Regions:
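Nucleotide-binding/hydrolysis machinery
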Residues: 2-22, 40, 46-48, 88-93, ...
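Bacterial C-terminal helix-turn-helix
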Residues: 2-9, 13, 297-352
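Conserved helical "switch/dimer-interface" subregion of ABC/ABC-like ATPase nucleotide-binding domains
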Residues: 56, 87, 115, 154, ...
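Conserved RecA-like P-loop NTPase ATPase core
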Residues: 53, 75, 98, 112, ...
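Amphipathic HAMP/coiled-coil signal-transducing linker helices
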Residues: 26-41, 294
Length: 352
């Protein structure tokens, strides 16, 4: 049975290997022509929502305009940034990534602009910053909403004047680099709170592209499942060639607050746990996810859905956040992102 001839839902109890209840997965295909748009290998999906994004990528790629990618965590913003670079005249030049949320504030300026020997305590050698490494290429600034206020004027200078100085140097260096930034945060709301400069926002927001969450492109989920099964099976040296139809239906119906990253994590765990050639998504895990998306009481906002889902996973893991079996891994996030989401959603660890 192919992915184009799905019949579901079926009762899980009725499934057996000799009744053809599974969707056959074409895991031997290498180039995945049916899963990706031509020229966008690695970006999986054929939905109209994704095609709209890729059309915008093709439109903006050939210029040098700054691009701002907007979307929830785990939606694939880095893949879109790389697609912009690979479709641009700078494709043969460096693509340099800097995650503004992953580097301590005290080190971020040095990562951006570099430093001279002796610029500060511990600077025992000259360091070339990411801006300089990206010369004639593209600089991808992930989580731009987390850049400290004191560093924002210097980034604005790079965008406006195309120049900077290394820390500890008075020599101004000219730079030729295209900036693509990304964030899951509400930058306009941050401006109103005094947390983000409006002039920097306007420089970044020349060509915004909104990346749709996975729940808005459910028709892409079977293709993503096939892709992630293929990747995980190869990595783990296993053979998985089918998935129960009701499992695929449940995966497709679920809202995926962690988006593609969460789906990838769920599939890898399922491949690890599957003993035969049929993908077995843990029934308890799958049922908790489906319940979160199909509860009797309709939740008012997406934040409510996300809050309840994170709480459910935290209870399953006994509030253990780290490690391969922790809540962060189950949700497809890193621990710092989970801490941030818990704080934002008002989730407090109970006293045991």
């Amino acid at each position: 049975m192919s992915l184009n001839s799905l019949t579901y839902p079926l009762r899980y109890e009725d499934l057996s290997l000799d009744t053809d209840p599974e969707i056959r997965l074409d895991i031997d295909r290498i180039d995945e022509p049916a899963n990706s748009e031509p020229g966008f290998e690695g970006i999986i999906g054929r939905s109209s929502a994704l095609r709209s994004v890729l059309q915008m990528v093709e439109t903006v790629a050939w210029g040098d305009s700054t691009v701002l990618l907007l979307g929830e965590t785990g939606t694939g913003k880095e893949l879109i940034a790389r697609a912009i670079h690979s479709h641009s005249p700078r494709r043969d030049r460096p693509f340099v990534k800097l995650n503004c949320a992953a580097i301590p504030t005290g080190l971020l300026e040095s990562e951006f602009f570099g430093h001279e020997r002796g610029a500060f305590t511990g600077a025992i050698a000259q360091k070339i910053g990411r801006v300089e490494v990206a010369e004639q290429g593209s600089l991808f600034l992930d989580e731009i909403g987390d850049i400290p206020l004191e560093l924002q004027p210097k980034l604005l200078r790079v965008l406006q004047e195309r120049e900077f100085e290394r820390l500890g140097s008075t020599r101004t260096k000219k730079i030729d680099v295209r900036v693509v930034a990304a964030t899951h945060r509400d930058l306009e709301g941050m401006i109103l709170k005094g947390e983000f400069r409006s002039d920097l926002y306007y420089r970044l927001n020349v060509f915004p592209i909104s990346i749709p969450p996975l729940r808005e492109r459910p028709e892409d989920i079977p293709l993503l499942v096939e892709h992630f099964v293929q990747e995980a099976a190869r990595k783990l040296n296993k053979t998985i060639d089918a998935i129960p139809s009701d499992s695929m239906a449940a995966l497709t119906d679920y809202q995926w607050p962690g988006n593609i990253r969460e789906l990838e994590n769920v599939i890898e765990r399922a491949v690890i746990l599957s003993r035969g050639s049929v993908l077995r998504v843990p029934r308890r895990d799958l049922q908790s996810r489906v319940t979160a998306g199909h509860s009797g009481a309709k939740l008012e906002t997406l934040a409510d859905v996300e809050r309840e889902h994170i709480r459910a996973v935290l209870k399953q893991t006994r509030w253990v956040l780290s490690g391969p079996g922790g809540a962060a891994a189950r949700l497809g996030m890193n621990r710092s992102t989970l801490y941030f989401r818990m704080k934002k959603l008002g989730i407090v660890r109970p006293c045991f």
